[in-house]
Amino acid sequence: MNYKEWLAQAIADLAKKNPTENSKIDALVLLQHATGKSRTQILAFDDTEIDEKVRLKLTALLDRRLKGEPIAYILGEKEFWSLPLNVSKGTLIPRPDTEILVEKALQIALEKLEENPPHFRILDLGTGTGAIALALASELAPICQKRHIPLEIIGVDLMSDVVALAQSNAERNQLNVEFLQSRWFDNITGKFDLIVSNPPYIDAQDEHLHQGDVRFEPLSALVANDEGYADLRHIIELASSYLNSNGVLLLEHGWQQGEKVRSIFQENHWEMVETVRDYSDNERVTLGFWKK
């Protein structure tokens, strides 16, 4: 069997099993992963015969995808903000919608850096793969270096293996971010200019937990008590103690949670509370300033 024949069969199998997914892209990515060849090489030399060892590997990979396992877990990596990130089954898979949080955090950070502060500190709570912290570091480190403003970015996660994974991503992308093990603020000292988080926010009874990629993702990174609001509320209530004056907290949340999250911010005396919409025009990120 050659590349062309395997692709045709794999595309047909995937389309039959998961008609809403892009079967051609999935099949090609799996073939690239198994052979170590680029997309261009595979398509240009599609009559290349597949040896038995690679064919067995492809069969195993395709079987996992046919069962619905996300491509990111099969490959062990996912790109976010143009950064290649290692992923594991202990972390959420970084999603494009989370780039909305990064974009807004960058906008606020750049405005604050215009004031030439003596230093700039950012905290990422529940960092997972480190995606948010590393994306911010990739953009802000060159700017802070040019302006001679010391930049410190810290990412925390509850699980030690997840912290190690995030650290591996910092090393892979040669970015200076410190990753610590902590349950939210428990092991955090000092104050920050920005606090960002994509915490668990799904209700345990949500039917979407049994659909698509989330079936394979860790429930601890997805589900929160109090109909999904427990961790959001906890962070909003405590974050003010860890922010400098005029510091900002930015939180990602579910597309139907914006109104409730804004009210929790306001109940806790945050100012200039606003919600940012994602690429699908859903309320996705809510932020507030701490003026006290």
UniProtKB/Swiss-Prot annotation:
Disulfide bond annotation, renumbered to this chain: none
UniProt protein name: Release factor glutamine methyltransferase
InterPro entries: DNA_methylase_N6_adenine_CS, HemK-like, Methyltranfer_dom, N5-glutamine_MTase, PrmC_N, RF_methyltr_PrmC, SAM-dependent_MTases_sf
Source species of the chain: Haemophilus influenzae (strain ATCC 51907 / DSM 11121 / KW20 / Rd)
GO biological process, alphabetically ordered: methylation; translational termination
Family, as annotated: Belongs to the protein N5-glutamine methyltransferase family. PrmC subfamily.
UniProt superkingdom: Bacteria
E.C. code: 2.1.1.297
Top EC class, one word: transferase
Record-listed substrate binding positions: N198, P199, P200, Y201
Keyword entries, A-Z: Methyltransferase, S-adenosyl-L-methionine, Transferase
Chain sites annotated for binding S-adenosyl-L-methionine: G126, T127, G128, T129, G130, D157, W184, N198
HAMAP family referenced in this protein's UniProt entry, alphabetically: RF_methyltr_PrmC
Catalytic reaction annotation: L-glutaminyl-[peptide chain release factor] + S-adenosyl-L-methionine = N(5)-methyl-L-glutaminyl-[peptide chain release factor] + S-adenosyl-L-homocysteine + H(+)
Function in brief: Methylates the class 1 translation termination release factors RF1/PrfA and RF2/PrfB on the glutamine residue of the universally conserved GGQ motif.
One protein family per Pfam: PrmC_N
MF (Gene Ontology): nucleic acid binding; protein-(glutamine-N5) methyltransferase activity; protein-glutamine N-methyltransferase activity
